[in-house]
Amino acid sequence: MKRILIGVGVLLLLAAGAAAGIWAWKARNPADVRGSATQEFETTEEPGATTRPETEILEEPWPQYGFDLARTRYAPDFKLRPPFRRLWDVRGGKLIEYPPVVAYGHVYFATSDGRFFAVDAETGKKTWERELGRCTAASPAAGNGIVYQPVMHGFPCGKRRNQPSFLFAMDAHTGAVKWRFRAGVIETSPLLVDGRIYVGSWDTRVYALDAATGRKLWSFKTGDAVKGGAAFAKGTIFVGSYDGHVYALNSNTGKLRWRASAQSRFGGKGTFYATPAVAYGRVYIGNTDGKVYAFGAQSGKLLWSKTTGNYVYSSAAVWDRKVYAGSYDGHFYALDAATGDIRWKFEAHGPISGSPTVLDGIVYFSTLKQRTFALDARTGRRVWTFPDGKYSPVVADEKHLYLTGYTRVYALEPSSR
């Protein structure tokens, strides 16, 4: 009888352990939320639509990270399709983690050791160069004859850890410094909207600055470092924080409109490193918990979440009612913008950290194994590859595709031309 009781006890303990394990797994991996096209899904807010507000019409070919103010990473007017041939390439000498911007007939980019280049877009010849004295991990922004570039101290800058960080404003034609704004570590790619610059910092704040003078207009404190860039739509700034929340702020005053949360895991949350993209009345953003999220742009309500197999540092691109993002699990995903369902996924055989771009029905991305892929954005079929590129590879203008390699920027044009 004692043996029977002991056996029953062991079975009960095993069952309890299994139940606890299942509970722990579910707590660590909360179930995905499936969305609907009937809830806060505005089909008139298609990326690239001609109905977008006048403030969103761009004066330069590719003036900031993510292309437009909503950071959709989709450029509707550039008809460039592979295969490509190389026109020129420029060596930066060090890692180029973030892509350039294209404005005023130039390609502007920074290397990780703080060198900033202005290169003629047609010839690849260097027009000017400036040593910024700090390392960089962000794209510039360009407008009003000025190029804005953040720099940082701290990791991975080593011995420069105790030095301040700045946002530099430089004359786009000469490189002369017009002003600089001091803050905590700035890893966010700045957003230029209607004469204002929006940038986040490791000091937990989002800043709004006068783009002409650098004067601080307002700041908003989040719960942790702000490492991703901000997006703009309908008078609202959207930004993610390492505290596991997405914030919607009044672009004029900095007042909080709403705060949304990643799904909890054991009482904690993943962090938002990615820059949000705004389309269809929704805010799309990846998280280090391995999920891509969609929140209502007006309400902040969680509309859907979709789990990938690992971290999502990749900032999403949005086009054709699909959300495109890469994951550290080595897959590139096309998700239904309304529901979050997987429309297709592509095995890239390497972690994906950077962000995609959509041009003329082709989506481009790179893996950490330093290969760039071009896929049919509707089907996921591979159409072209390039043996360089590691993070966010592609920007463009009407004639050229500019591909960011590990230490080089390439200018490519379609082979058919």
What are these regions (language model features)?
Residues 1-14:
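N-terminal Sec-pathway targeting helices
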Residues 14-24:
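Hydrophobic alpha-helical membrane-insertion segments, chiefly the h-region
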Residues 25-51:
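Ser/Thr/Pro/Gly-rich low-complexity linker/stalk segments immediately outside membranes or between
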Residues 48-86:
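Blade/loop signatures of beta-propeller domains
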Residues 88-101, 129-144, 149-166, 177-193, ...:
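Extracytoplasmic beta-rich repeat domains
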Residues 120-124, 171-174, 210-214, 250-254, ...:
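Short loop/turn segments that connect beta-strands within beta-propeller blades
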